[in-house]
From Swiss-Prot:
It is found in: Cell membrane. Disulfide bonds: none annotated. Coiled coil: none annotated. Residues 1-37, 107-119, 193-202 are cytoplasmic. Belongs to the Casparian strip membrane proteins (CASP) family. It is a multi-pass membrane protein. It comes from Zea mays. This is CASP-like protein 1D1. The keyword 4Fe-4S does not apply. The lineage of its organism: Eukaryota, Viridiplantae, Streptophyta, Embryophyta, Tracheophyta.
Amino acid sequence: MATVDATTTAGSGKQTDAAPSPPAAAAAACRSLSGADLALRVLLFAVTLSGLVVLATAEQTVRVPVPQIPGLVLSLPAKFKDSPALIYLLVALCVTCFYSLLSTAFTSLKLLFGSSPSRTLFLLVLFDVFYAAIMASATGSAGGVAWIGLKGNSHTNWNKICNIYGKFCRHIGSSVFLGLIASVVLVLLTILNAHSLYRRSR
């Protein structure tokens, strides 16, 4: 009987070593989610900073001859400051970039010192949703301006300008694209942290 008990004890010990305990598995899953959260926030910072720099440098001056007056050439500048929608996108990129920096630091501390309280995680979800809405609205507004600059609008007699201001339009288009990526990243962060809250509530 002693031999059987010893064998059973040894077998159960092997099973314990082979399968991790539920708390250990939960901690590993939590760290995995936190790592994904940190990677997305670093990506968000890089994207918003790049979009901010690209949009802030969106400026071009072209020399356009006046057909009615031979020899007269006008210097016509194009700046992002000329459009309220582009200014809105710049502000949205700026505040989202600052938020991504703060949230990246917070997530790094969470990885170092353990999981954060559910209340803090819930606030993080709310902020992610808030900034996702800001970025989506700003990107949509700027995208409308960029489309008119690219294609024009014959119904309102708005002429396209991208055939003249090529560099300026490339900057605007790139910043709108980066703003769209930032919006998608924020949505992914919202889903990820909402899933973390769901795991804790089970």
